[in-house]
Amino acid sequence: MDFIEAHGFSALPIAASQSTNTDKDAYRGVFQHKTAAVLAGLGFIGKSGLFITKEYGSKVRLATVLTDMPLIPSGAVITEGCGTCEICKNACPAGAITGRNYVYGAPRDTILDAARCSAHMKTYKDIGRGAVCGICMRVCPYNRRKRESDAAAD
């Protein structure tokens, strides 16, 4: 932000974890960080509903800075990167992943039943588990490639 503002442009940060919380079952944030990242050419939204990059898989956390600074997208918009893969769908213990490819502008429910995912994890809240199980992240081939490249570097 300092760089942007030092060049005379405005910068408004939007944290990744801000949510509207007006509807306890909406599971939505105040800003669509994943959509913005796709339009910036940084990656794609997978069948799991996770934002995925070729370099880091879904092991990313997004925040956004809105600015009036003229910027060029990092790359071409990737409309889908999962193809026919259904590993996450088949591994999801909640059955929350439909197996459909993400289509820009389509409702999230066409690819992921967020309420079903959340309900599955609520069954484990008494043992101190988090809000998501992460199995879709664990089995994603994009994350596997990252683990293999990390192991090769060691």
Model-derived features: positions:
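Catalytic cores of enzyme domains
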Residues: M1-D154
